[in-house]
Amino acid sequence: MLLTAEFWVAVAFVAFLVIVWRVGGFSMMTNGLDSRAKRVRNELDEARRLREEAAAVLADYKRRRTEAEREAEAIISGAREDAERIAAEGHARLNDFVARRTKSAEAKIAQAEAQASAQVRAAAADAAVKVSETLLRERLQGAAAQDLLRASLGDVKSRLQA
């Protein structure tokens, strides 16, 4: 048993462990592992902090985007209301303009009708006077006829034009 290779490997391994322990190798290994664990823990803490910071930035971005969307919607609805109001005002102004033009045209037509009617009456009166004058001239003779004719024609003319 003392001469087997496994025995001497075991003795050498135990001797190696004793030497490593004496030199402080175990404490160096544990210190190295502890420092590595500490560094990993710090990196995890930093990653957690960065993740929380990113989540806060994302939440802020979402809040700002929501506010911007609300503001844009308010601007759009305001613009729509303004456009509708302006269109309604335009329609009202157009309707007023058309009504004024119609009223003006109707007044001009009524004035033209009245003027035409007066001209027709005047022309009819003149024609009636001329016809009457011609008939009376042919039928009545003398100075008395002329005086009667003038008086009658003046009377007829004034009555027809009134």
From Swiss-Prot:
GO terms for cellular component: plasma membrane; proton-transporting ATP synthase complex. It is a single-pass membrane protein. It is found in: Cell inner membrane. Keywords: ATP synthesis, Cell inner membrane, Cell membrane, CF(0), Hydrogen ion transport, Ion transport, Membrane, Transmembrane, Transmembrane helix, Transport. One of its GO terms (molecular function) is proton-transporting ATP synthase activity, rotational mechanism. InterPro entries: ATP_synth_b/b'su_bac/chlpt (IPR002146), ATP_synthase_B_chain (IPR050059). The chain crosses the membrane at residues 1-21. It comes from the Bacteria. Disulfide bonds: none annotated. It holds the Pfam family ATP-synt_B. F(1)F(0) ATP synthase produces ATP from ADP in the presence of a proton or sodium gradient. F-type ATPases consist of two structural domains, F(1) containing the extramembraneous catalytic core and F(0) containing the membrane proton channel, linked together by a central stalk and a peripheral stalk. During catalysis, ATP synthesis in the catalytic domain of F(1) is coupled via a rotary mechanism of the central stalk subunits to proton translocation. Component of the F(0) channel, it forms part of the peripheral stalk, linking F(1) to F(0). F-type ATPases have 2 components, F(1) - the catalytic core - and F(0) - the membrane proton channel. F(1) has five subunits: alpha(3), beta(3), gamma(1), delta(1), epsilon(1). F(0) has three main subunits: a(1), b(2) and c(10-14). The alpha and beta chains form an alternating ring which encloses part of the gamma chain. F(1) is attached to F(0) by a central stalk formed by the gamma and epsilon chains, while a peripheral stalk is formed by the delta and b chains. Belongs to the ATPase B chain family. This is ATP synthase subunit b 1. It comes from Methylorubrum extorquens (strain PA1) (Methylobacterium extorquens). The gene is atpF1.
